[in-house]
């Protein structure tokens, strides 16, 4: 999502420049870049490049500035950018009245944008695009949509395969959506359990390092009571206590990265998703072959009686000669 793209001669660099300049103190560069791409798609597809891009951007910037105020958002997950994009394309009054379901009220526009983000390079018909759009609209109403879309952003190919397969397997939108949700919830549960395990370990390491620093300060304070150099040493160690938990978490992260059990668990999750993706590719290929076979009509050979009669007569004439 960070690379500049061109849609109907509209370069997203134009959008990125204004978004980054206006929100450099509020949002991460990655979030600004993602929002700019979404705005470029919306401007091109929904508004058909009218009015001028500058006017459209100015209006969107005003809405988001009003909404953010002095707030700073360091979270650069895709779901955050999506919500901010929804605020930018929604009338100010509606933003104020419906802060809790901002994504749902702009679901048509957001769903259309998501189709372009994930399926612009896929060879699909307009009816299939509409079907995928409806799947996104249904997913937008889910409570854990932010988790689903963030994971989809991290594993685009797998997400695309799952949607395409569900769309081909089920004619009913609800059934297709249920299939996608079940599959991603399974992956999310596996990943969440793994992430929580790692976070607990890092936090525990942080607490241990913090406790060690605190004991060290106490011991040095007693040992250097009344000494002039304690004025320098103790504040330094107190400073160390303040940053000890973060340091401890870094140490914990280093241990996890070099732990064979953790490596194996991460490898198992990666392998599971890879297998899932390969299975989807195989199933989609099989469905494609089946479709081609069903579309092939075998035409029975037509018998040309005149030609047969001519061949028979020629044979008779040859027989007479010999």
Swiss-Prot record:
GO terms under cellular component: membrane
Record-linked InterPro entries: Uncharacterised_RP853
Origin superkingdom: Bacteria
Subcellular location(s) per record: Membrane
Membrane topology note: Single-pass membrane protein
Residues passing through the membrane, by range: 212-234
Major site of localization recorded for this protein: membrane
Keyword terms, alphabetized: Membrane, Transmembrane, Transmembrane helix
One Pfam family per UniProt: RP853
Name of the protein in question: Uncharacterized protein RP853
